[in-house]
């Protein structure tokens, strides 16, 4: 161990290790999100959601995922050091949260009168994105929690809004299930995160 390494406080070294683990875990996620977004757009179109807004939504997912991929390659080339890790981590988190918000916002594209299947499809999508946030980034629980809030909360709130507007008990039940499911996932993710670095 060098003098330079030993001069770094322990909590700073642990923070660097956690950020390095975060970036390692992120490898491949942009492709997963593009694939998931594309399949979601096709599935939602098939159950009556208008195709044009879904194409725009998917184009934004594609663009942002491309930016994340390019940024991660930049970080890999540059390397993570004690000096740059914090700022690079914050930029990557910002990009990831914008992408999560896009996935969370897809529920707003479901028009009134659409088949209940559309709501279930969106639930599968946002749950998968939230789970990906927790599983891939166990060393950064707060990031996973933010992804969850940006994906599941809009979905549940939209279902509750539609329930009060339309009186469809299915939407009330779906919103409740989304919140209960996330409470279960959050508790498990917190346990895993505490056992990480």
Predicted segment positions?
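Juxtamembrane helix-capping/reentrant segments at transmembrane boundaries
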Residues: 80-96
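Hydrophobic transmembrane alpha-helices
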Residues: 95-187
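Cytosolic signal-transmission helices at domain junctions
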Residues: 194-197
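Short, Lys/Arg-rich, polar N-terminal cytosolic tail immediately upstream
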Residues: 1-22
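Short, glycine- and charge-enriched coil/turn segments that flank and shape catalytic ligand pockets
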Residues: 76-84, 161-163
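Hydrophobic alpha-helical transmembrane segments of multi-pass membrane proteins
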Residues: 23-79, 175, 179-180, 184
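Membrane interfacial helix-start motif at the N-side
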Residues: 18-28, 138-141
